[in-house]
């Protein structure tokens, strides 16, 4: 029998038929919807006189456009000041009501960012194919699932047929062996990977993360890593199923029960790459070599360790790369050879589908406890990824830690990850952000984004500039997974 990778196994389990042109019809187990990429898809169903093929395979929640202050949320839909944003959230409510799709509406305790809500509800399960009209759907691959983002026309296609046409990708394995040093996290792993292979390194590949450092990561940490596979150029990121995966899923609302659970676990336990499976590309890193990472430029691959300096374009021989560095330095308002620790900040954002889970908040709170946000920081936001994460954090007293330190404690949503809601950067402002993208204008027109882990973001907030979180001593305990 031919040895298979995890991706091979998931593909074979869901391939309905193979076409003459080399593409395949793939069955989709779970479809997650939000307010931005679904309106036209639902309208397409109406115009064609169709209904969703499998209503129970879909769940929905608004996240991109929702406001995050308590006052705005208490005001309901009318409190959404932007007309387009308000219409999109309202339209999602109406579409889900009309078609009978389960939606966690804006003020439902279960509402949150789609890539946080799916796993915590058990709607994401090992062995599934999972799609959503959002590129960071790769997050769900942390569960040994085949998960990727789709466009609006594909959202309609999945609603109507529960299938998609796709071509099989190549296999890439990223192996991270060893033990992470104190103060180094899952976010640092994935930023280091992107720094090594670049934002095109995974093009055309399904990327499996493996190795002892990945196995040691929590499910939250694995979700962080798979979340940013797309920034490494791969549409799909995944981690093999193990006992941590199964323990996380057990007992969640959508998880199988009783005999169905036992049968599911038996299948899930096979969702690992065979020992002699072939990977088209293998990338290796040593965990011990990874330090806390900070992005300095306008692409996720423009990332350095905290103890390094911003690059000098004059030292770059490749003219294309030299021009890219020069443009990034100009946009970011930085100078060649500037120490990363000399980058001063205006705002701090802890949240997003990358880093807004309970372990992320615990890690940031461990650093913030007993400290104060620096007087030079205009705003430091903490935005939980869901209402359930928020409730758990409050039960643990994390909200009080943040509030005492001078952070703002918000309601769940995508928030400052992207400029589609009231939480935005002003032009020229530097932000330490736990999100996943640092393109020009991503967090607001002219805004300057630096990608970091939650612990590094909290350390920057209390310092006013980037610092090595490892130098803050025992406060860094427990930050490894985030």
Curated annotation (Swiss-Prot):
Cited NCBIfam families: leuC, PRK05478.1, PRK12466.1
InterPro entries found in the cross-reference section? 3-IsopropMal_deHydase_lsu (IPR004430), Acnase/IPM_dHydase_lsu_aba_1/3 (IPR015931), Acoase/IPM_deHydtase_lsu_aba (IPR001030), Aconitase_4Fe-4S_BS (IPR018136), Aconitase_4Fe-4S_dom (IPR036008), IPM_dehydratase_rel_enz (IPR050067), IPMI_cat (IPR033941)
Q: How is the cofactor bound?
A: Binds 1 [4Fe-4S] cluster per subunit.
Report what the protein is called.
3-isopropylmalate dehydratase large subunit
| EC number per UniProt | 4.2.1.33
| Annotated region described as Disordered, given as residue ranges | 60-79
Q: Where does [4Fe-4S] cluster bind?
A: 353, 414, 417
Q: Give the Gene3D superfamilies listed for this entry.
A: Aconitase, domain 3
Reactions performed catalytically: (2R,3S)-3-isopropylmalate = (2S)-2-isopropylmalate
Q: How does it assemble?
A: Heterodimer of LeuC and LeuD.
GO BP: any one term: L-leucine biosynthetic process
Pathway given in the UniProt record: Amino-acid biosynthesis; L-leucine biosynthesis; L-leucine from 3-methyl-2-oxobutanoate: step 2/4
Q: Which Pfam family is one of those matched by this entry?
A: Aconitase
- Source organism of this protein record: Xanthomonas euvesicatoria pv. vesicatoria (strain 85-10)
């Amino acid at each position: 029998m031919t040895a298979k990778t995890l991706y091979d196994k998931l593909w074979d389990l869901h391939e309905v038929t193979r076409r003459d042109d080399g593409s395949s019809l793939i069955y989709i187990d779970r479809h997650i919807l939000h307010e931005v990429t679904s309106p036209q898809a639902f309208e397409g169903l109406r115009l064609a006189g169709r209904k969703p093929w499998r209503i129970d395979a879909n769940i929905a929640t608004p996240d991109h456009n929702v406001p995050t202050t308590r006052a705005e949320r208490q005001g309901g839909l009318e409190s959404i000041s932007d007309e387009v944003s308000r219409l999109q959230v309202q339209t999602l409510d109406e579409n889900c009501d009309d078609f009978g799709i389960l939606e966690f509406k804006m003020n439902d305790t279960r509402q949150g960012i789609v890539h946080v809500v799916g796993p915590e509800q058990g709607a994401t399960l090992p062995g599934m194919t999972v799609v959503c009209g959002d590129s960071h759907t790769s997050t769900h691959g942390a569960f040994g699932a085949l998960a990727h983002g789709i466009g609006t026309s594909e959202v309609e296609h999945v609603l109507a047929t529960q299938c998609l046409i796709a071509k099989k990708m190549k296999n890439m394995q990223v192996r991270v062996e060893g033990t992470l040093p104190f103060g180094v996290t899952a976010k640092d792993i994935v930023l280091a990977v992107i720094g090594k292979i670049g934002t095109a390194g995974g093009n055309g590949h399904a990327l499996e993360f493996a190795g002892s450092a990945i196995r040691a990561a929590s499910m939250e940490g694995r979700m962080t890593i798979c979340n940013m596979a797309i920034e490494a150029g791969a549409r799909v990121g995944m981690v093999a199923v193990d006992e941590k995966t199964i323990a996380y899923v057990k007992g969640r609302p959508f998880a199988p029960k009783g005999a169905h659970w036992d049968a599911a676990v038996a299948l899930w336990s096979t969702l690992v790459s065979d020992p002699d499976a072939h990977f088209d590309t293998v990338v290796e890193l040593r965990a011990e070599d990874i330090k806390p990472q900070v992005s300095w430029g306008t692409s996720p691959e423009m990332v350095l360790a905290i103890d390094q300096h911003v690059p000098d374009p004059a030292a770059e021989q490749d003219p294309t790369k030299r021009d890219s560095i020069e443009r990034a330095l100009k946009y970011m308002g930085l100078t060649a050879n500037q120490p990363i620790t000399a980058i001063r900040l205006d705002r701090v954002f802890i949240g997003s589908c990358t880093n807004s889970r309970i372990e992320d908040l615990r890690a940031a709170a461990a650093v913030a406890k007993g400290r104060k946000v620096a007087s030079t920081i205009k705003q430091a936001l903490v935005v939980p990824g869901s209402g359930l994460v928020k409730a758990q954090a409050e039960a643990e007293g994390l909200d009080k830690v943040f509030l005492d330190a001078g952070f703002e404690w918000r309601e769940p949503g995508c928030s400052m990850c992207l400029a589609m809601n009231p939480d935005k950067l002003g032009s020229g402002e530097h932000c330490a952000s736990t999100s996943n993208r640092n393109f020009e204008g991503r967090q607001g027109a002219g805004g300057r984004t630096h990608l970091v882990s939650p612990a590094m973001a909290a350390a920057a907030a209390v310092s006013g500039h980037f610092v090595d979180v490892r130098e803050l001593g025992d406060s860094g305990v427990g930050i490894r997974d985030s």
